[in-house]
Amino acid sequence: MADKIRVVVLYGGRSGEHEVSLKSAASVFRHLDRTRFEVIPVSIDKTGRWQWNDLRSLDQAHAAALPILPDAPEMRLARGPDGRGVLVPITQGAAAPIAIDVVFPVIHGPLCEDGTVQGLLELADVAYVGSGVLASAVSMDKDVAKRLAEFAGIPVAPYRVLTRKAFVQDRVSSLAKAVEGLSLPVFVKPCNMGSSVGIHKVKTQDALEAALDDAFRYDVKVLVQQGIDAREIEVAVLEDETLFASLASELNPNAHHEFYSYEAKYLDPDGARVDLPARLDAAQMERVRSLATRVFAALECSGFARVDFFLDRKTGEFCFNEINTLPGFTSISMYPKMMEASGVPYGELLSRLVDLALDRHRQRQSLERGYAS
C-alpha cells in the first residue's frame, strides 16, 4: 500500500479573518479523505507563531472551529536533507520533525492569502493548494484586480482609491476626491481585506469620514466604489484540464442587513437567503460563468477561486466585483456549495485541489533553475 500523502492544513493567521479561518479549517479537516491523506493541523496564531496541534482526540463531527492548543509546540518550516518540506520544532525535543508533502492554506486576509505565505512556501519548495505569489497578491488587492480585469475587457463598477498617507495629510481634499464622479450611496472598502471586514455603505456625505477612518484601520489603501442597484452573483472556478465554472449562486441579504456584511455572513444565521442556482436565464448563466473564467485567467490564478459579480438591475449587465483565491470553506461557504451543486462533492473537491497542487509543484520542479552558455 502506498504511503499516504501528508497534507498540512494551515489555519489561523495574523489577519482580521482569523476566526473565519478556524471555521473553514474545521470543515476541511473533517472532509479530507483519510484513506489517501494524513492530515497535519498547523496553526498560525495572532502573533504569527506556527504551531503543530495534535488534534487526534478532536471530535471532528462536531467541531465548529479548529482550535489552537495553548501548549502546542512552535514549529518552523524548512527543507529536509532529501529536499522534502519538513516542520521542525523551535525548541529541540518539543516534538519530532514532521515531513510534509503539500500545504492546504485555509487562511484568509492579509499576510495569509496575499502572496506572503505562498512566497514562503515557494522558498521552502513545498507544494501548496491554490494560486501562486503573483495571482494571490493581485487578487487580494481590490484596486489592482479591477484594473487587470478592465484591461482584459471585463466591466467593473466605477470607483476611486485613497491612500492613508494622503488622507492623513489632507482630509478635506481626500473626502472630496473619494466621491469625485460618483453619486451616493457608495461602498467604502479596505483594498486588502475579505469577509466584508471594514466595509461600510455610505449614504450621506457626513458619514463618509467615519467610514474611511474605520476602513483605514485595516489597510493603507481604501477603495470607494459606486453603489449600484444590483443583484450579487457568485461563481466558483476550478482549474482542471480546462477551467470549470460552477452554476452561479445569488446572495439576498435579509432586510435588516443593507448589504452582505461580516455580521450577515458569519454572526446572523438568517443573514441572507441564497439562491443556488441563481435565478438567471440561460444566456445570463452562460455569460457570468464565462466572465468568471476570464477573470480567473486574466489574474493568472491557479487551483480555485470564487469570483463575485454585480448584475445591474437597470442595464442587465454584469460587472466584476472581486475575486477570492482562498474562499471560505465553512459550513455555509458558497464555494464548496456551488461546486457540489455542479457535480463536484466536497470530499472529491478537496482531493482534486491537493492533486492539482502536487501536479503544479512537479511542473515547477521540472524547470531549469540555472543557465550555462
From Swiss-Prot:
Domain ATP-grasp as annotated: residue spans: 146-355
MF terms in GO: ATP binding; D-alanine-D-alanine ligase activity; metal ion binding
List of residues binding ATP: 179-234
PROSITE patterns attached to this UniProt entry: ATP_GRASP (PS50975), DALA_DALA_LIGASE_1 (PS00843), DALA_DALA_LIGASE_2 (PS00844)
Compartments, as annotated in UniProt: Cytoplasm
A Pfam cross-reference name: Dala_Dala_lig_N
Binding site for Mg(2+) 1: 308, 322
Pathway annotation from the record: Cell wall biogenesis; peptidoglycan biosynthesis
GO BP term, pick one: regulation of cell shape
Domain of life: Bacteria
Needed cofactors: Mg(2+); Mn(2+)
Alphabetically ordered keywords of this record: ATP-binding, Cell shape, Cell wall biogenesis/degradation, Cytoplasm, Ligase, Magnesium, Manganese, Metal-binding, Nucleotide-binding, Peptidoglycan synthesis
Cofactor binding note: Binds 2 magnesium or manganese ions per subunit.
EC numbers: 6.3.2.4
Residue sites binding Mg(2+) 2 per the record: 322, 324
Coiled-coil portions: none
Reactions it catalyzes: 2 D-alanine + ATP = D-alanyl-D-alanine + ADP + phosphate + H(+)
Top EC category: ligase
Key word Ligase present: yes
Assigned protein family: Belongs to the D-alanine--D-alanine ligase family.
Function summary: Cell wall formation.
Name this protein carries in UniProt: D-alanine--D-alanine ligase A
Annotated organism of origin: Bradyrhizobium diazoefficiens (strain JCM 10833 / BCRC 13528 / IAM 13628 / NBRC 14792 / USDA 110)
